[in-house]
């Protein structure tokens, strides 16, 4: 109990969006979703970023679990935050050691994901110790909730409807869903750092990242060098 209380205090000292946990969720292993996933050729992966201080949730989808899609997720998030004056310099982006985020252990290469965190965001990429899943508890909790409250609870007649319902869920989660552990909605907690921030700042309509490659190809190349 003491350790949990200490961890809560550490999180409460953070500013909004000062630390984000980023992870990927598989969608093809959800029994209630599988038939619609197969029939409508829905994306296989959910790319997730969750703010440790506020619980704010940001998601996008990918057909591939690739470093390119992870980088596109960062670019679109950065673009969105910048639009509302949210500064990411000095923040921490935490991930596991998956190859969509990091190079293999025996490689000295730096991935485009890490380069974007450091150069575009001006942030720090923190990798958790191998196998230390509890380090990602905030984002893992959101994966459990979205599976129960969206993917297993709703029906989807098309890819378009899937994205529409995902957008509705993301808006509800950030603007209306009260988090008992954190004591408020994510939107109100973000406003403790950014007073008078419009609701739209935490509304991030999900997209399929693979479809953005042509649009962002030049920008990705710029940050990769």
Language model: regions and residue ranges:
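RNase H-like DDE/DDD metal-dependent nuclease/strand-transfer catalytic core used by mobile genetic elements
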Residues: 24-46, 52-164
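C-terminal domain-tail junction helix/linker
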Residues: 2-13, 18, 123, 145-225
